C-alpha cells in the first residue's frame, strides 16, 4: 500500500489522446510500436511524470531491426541519437519530472568497426573501454538536463568474465536526470531500516559491567545519572566538545615552536607517543587542508612531552554533555549503491530489467496515478511495475514482438494463438 504524496499526476487531461494514438492501449497503458523519436513526437507536452528506461547498449546486441538503437558504426553517432531522443523525453516530461537512465558499457574489439574499419588509431582502439554511459551523461548535461545521481547498480550474480587481463564488470550506472532543480522525489518510499546504532551509542552502551536492576525512583535516578546507561536510551548520546578550541593551524604553529625549542623532530614525537608518523605530523602541519587538532588524550601527552605552558589549556578543555540524535522514523536514505541481481532472459527479450530495480526507481519518482514512460520498453518490466503501483504506462519499442508477454498479461493478445485480437 503506497502512501499519499504531494506529487501531482501528469497527463490526466490528455490520457485519452495518448491512448487513441497508440498501437495498443488499455485503461492504464498505451503502447507505441515504431522508432522512439517518431513515437515520442505524438505524445503531449509535459504529460509524463517519470521515465524508467534502459536503451539498447552500443555495439552489444543486434535485436534484428534495421531502425534499432545501438547498431551505429560510431559511438559518437549513438550518443548523438540518444541525445535527440531525450530531447523529446524532455519535452513530454512534467516540469517536476525525472528520468532514470540505465546504460551499460562496452569494449572496442576487432568485431567493432569505426567508419566500416576496425579501430586502430586514437582512443578508439581494440580492448579500449568505450565509457559510453558517461559520454551520454555528459552530452545530456550539455543539452540541459540536471544529473542528480549516478547510482551504482551492483550485480551480485554477474557472470564471470573469461578475460585474464582485467576485472570482471559487476556493475552498471543508473543516472537520475531531472528537468529542473526542484522535482518530485519521495524519499520516504525508498528508505531502508536503521540496522545499527551509531558508533558512539554502541561504544558507550557496551562498555563496563552492569549488575542488579534499577527499581524505584532513587535507583532510576542513579541509572540515568550514569553516562554509560544514559547512552542506551534511544536518541541520547554522550559527546565530547571543545567549544573554545583554536584553529588547527594556529595550534600547529604553537606546537612547532615548542618542538623547535626542544630541538626535536616530528618523528621523535611520533616515536615517543607510539603513534604512526603519518598521523602525528598532521598535528604539526600549518596548512588548512592537512592540519588537525590532536584528540584529548594526545593533547595531554604532548603537553608533558614538549613541556607546554598553559596558553591553550582553557581552549583545549573538553566538555562532556548529552546530545539528542534521533533517527528518521521511516528509515535512512538508501544511498546510491543498489545491489540487485540481474533478471533471467525472457522468451522474447534477452536483456530484461530486474523488477526490483524498476520498483526502486518508480517508488521514488512516480506519484499516485502518475504516468511513466519507457521509450525502450522491451518486454515491459517497467510497465508491469507501474501497473502494480497504480500508475499509467506509456511504452515504446521498435519491435512489436518484444511486447508479447505484456500484451498477453493485459488481455490484448490471446495466449493460445499470440495473435492480435
From Swiss-Prot:
GO terms for molecular function: DNA binding; N-methyltransferase activity; site-specific DNA-methyltransferase (cytosine-N4-specific) activity. It holds the Pfam family N6_N4_Mtase. It catalyses: a 2'-deoxycytidine in DNA + S-adenosyl-L-methionine = an N(4)-methyl-2'-deoxycytidine in DNA + S-adenosyl-L-homocysteine + H(+). The keyword Methyltransferase applies. InterPro entries: DNA_methylase_N4/N6, MeTrfase_CN4_CS, RM_Methyltransferase, SAM-dependent_MTases_sf. Belongs to the N(4)/N(6)-methyltransferase family. N(4) subfamily. This is Type II methyltransferase M.SfiI. It comes from Streptomyces fimbriatus.
Amino acid at each position: 500500500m503506497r502512501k499519499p504524496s504531494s506529487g501531482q499526476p501528469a497527463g490526466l487531461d490528455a490520457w485519452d489522446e495518448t491512448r487513441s494514438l497508440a498501437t495498443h492501449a488499455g485503461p492504464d497503458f498505451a503502447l507505441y510500436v515504431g522508432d522512439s523519436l517518431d513515437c515520442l513526437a505524438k505524445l503531449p507536452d509535459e504529460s509524463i511524470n517519470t521515465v524508467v528506461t534502459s536503451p539498447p547498449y552500443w555495439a552489444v546486441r543486434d535485436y534484428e531491426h534495421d531502425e534499432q538503437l545501438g547498431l551505429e558504426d560510431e559511438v559518437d553517432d549513438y550518443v548523438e541519437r540518444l541525445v535527440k531522443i531525450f530531447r523529446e523525453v524532455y519535452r513530454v516530461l512534467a516540469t517536476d519530472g525525472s528520468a532514470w537512465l540505465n546504460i551499460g558499457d562496452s569494449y572496442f574489439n576487432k568485431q567493432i568497426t569505426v567508419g566500416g574499419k576496425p579501430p586502430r588509431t586514437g582512443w578508439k582502439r581494440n580492448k579500449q573501454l568505450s565509457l559510453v554511459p558517461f559520454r551520454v551523461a555528459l552530452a545530456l548535461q550539455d543539452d540541459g538536463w540536471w544529473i542528480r545521481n549516478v547510482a551504482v547498480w551492483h550485480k551480485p550474480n554477474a557472470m564471470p568474465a573469461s578475460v585474464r587481463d582485467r576485472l570482471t564488470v559487476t556493475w552498471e550506472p543508473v543516472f537520475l536526470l531531472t528537468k529542473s532543480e526542484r522535482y518530485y522525489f519521495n524519499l520516504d518510499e525508498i528508505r531502508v531500516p536503521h540496522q545499527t546504532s551509531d558508533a558512539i551509542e554502541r561504544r558507550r552502551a557496551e562498555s563496563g559491567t552492569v549488575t542488579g536492576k534499577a527499581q524505584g525512583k532513587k535507583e532510576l535516578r542513579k541509572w540515568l545519572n550514569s553516562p554509560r546507561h544514559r547512552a542506551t536510551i534511544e536518541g541520547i548520546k554522550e559527546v565530547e566538545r571543545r567549544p573554545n578550541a583554536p584553529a588547527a593551524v594556529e595550534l600547529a604553529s604553537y606546537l612547532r615552536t615548542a618542538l623547535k625549542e626542544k630541538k626535536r623532530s616530528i618523528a621523535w614525537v611520533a616515536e615517543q607517543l607510539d603513534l604512526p608518523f603519518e598521523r602525528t605530523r598532521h598535528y604539526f602541519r600549518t596548512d588548512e587542508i592537512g592540519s588537525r587538532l590532536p584528540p584529548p588524550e594526545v593533547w595531554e601527552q604532548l603537553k608533558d612531552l614538549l613541556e607546554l605552558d598553559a596558553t591553550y589549556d582553557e581552549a583545549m578543555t573538553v566538555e562532556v554533555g548529552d546530545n539528542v540524535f534521533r533517527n528518521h522514523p521511516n528509515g535512512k536514505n538508501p544511498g546510491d549503491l543498489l545491489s540487485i541481481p540481474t533478471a533471467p532472459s525472457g522468451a522474447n527479450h534477452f536483456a530484461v530489467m530486474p523488477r526490483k530495480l524498476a520498483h526502486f526507481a518508480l517508488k521514488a519518482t512516480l506519484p499516485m496515478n502518475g504516468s511513466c514512460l519507457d521509450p525502450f520498453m522491451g518486454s515491459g518490466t517497467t510497465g508491469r511495475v507501474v501497473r502494480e503501483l497504480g500508475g499509467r504506462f506509456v511504452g515504446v519499442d521498435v519491435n512489436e514482438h518484444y511486447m508479447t508477454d505484456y500484451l498477453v498479461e493485459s488481455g490484448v493478445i490471446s495466449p493460445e494463438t499470440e495473435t492480435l485480437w
